[in-house]
Amino acid sequence: MTETRPGPKPRISILVPTPLLITEITEPAAHRNRSSHESDVLMHPGGQGLWVARMAGSLGADVSVSGPFGGELGSLIRTMLDGLGMQVNAVRYGYGNGGYVYDLRGEDRETVAHMPPPELSRHELDDLYGTAFVDALASDVLTVTGAEPGDVVPASFFGRLIRDTRDAGTTVVADLSGKPALAAVAANVDVLKISHEEVLDLELVAEDTAEALVSAGHMLLERGAGAVVISRAKDPALLVEKDSVREVSAPSITPLAHRGAADSMTAGISVGLARGFDLVEAVALGASAGALNVARRGLGTGNRTTIEKFAREITVRTLS
């Protein structure tokens, strides 16, 4: 892997269509016997885009996020992001942000409450587009993440932003699924990161064998993507380019959590490209970030030095 040299921080601009407030109820770190309901209550900024942003920051990037913020939850999320040192390009959100409350005291994560955010209005979409586009022009890489629920932002929005940003000369990495993923491909996104489950949802192939997924990757290249990275949970990821197919694998790690690897991988790819790595090196950095994130408590968290050292242990094997 290319060694990181001292110099200006790589700048990553991240589109975050649905910033969320995540509240978790856990067993108390220390029992003080002060209440029959004694528990720890933790609050975090969350959602796909903010988890990508946290990992990009952990990897030493100068991170800015563009998204809608409003209502009581929006104010809390912005304050938390300020504390993490992120630049927040906030668009006014009339109805306000959504969030989750999870109970982690049992063996499985239990959803206690879910407040889904409403779709953005026409004027809010216009403001978000302009804010994200202008910020991307001052960045090394624009990373585009999806909305949850999907109807908050229309698929055409992603395609327009990606096309215009690429035409202006900024590299674009997209971590999208469904119609937004296809819109990104049609807009000639530089790198599409997508999971094997999401590939199946596109109905390009009927099974998730490596051969079928590679075939789907080539279909996405034919439709306009520059490269496709397919994550496969515990199995090696696939990097599909026009003239090559590579398998990217990490040493086995016992996970503490099964969520967060894909978002961390996207962050690593984005930071690698922003540093000037070639795509194979960037994907190796992403694979390292993703593998180590599941060995930690906290989505999108990681240690830069550890991730960069572990990236040397990532195996990249050429399949064709």
Predicted regions span which residues?
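Conserved phosphate-binding/catalytic region of the ribokinase-like
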Residues: E3, A210-S320
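Hydrophobic anchor at the start of a short beta-strand
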Residues: I12, A61-V63, V88, V172, ...
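Conserved N-terminal subdomain of the carbohydrate kinase-like
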Residues: R32-R34, S39, S58-V141, K309-S320
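Short beta-strand scaffold segments in enzyme catalytic cores
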Residues: R54, G99-D103, P236-L239
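Short beta-strands and strand-loop turn motifs
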Residues: V112-A113, S139-A147, D175, K193-H196
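Hydrophobic alpha-helical segments and helix pairs
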Residues: E119-T165, T171
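Conserved phosphate/ATP/ADP-binding segment of small-molecule kinases
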Residues: S156-V172, L176-D243
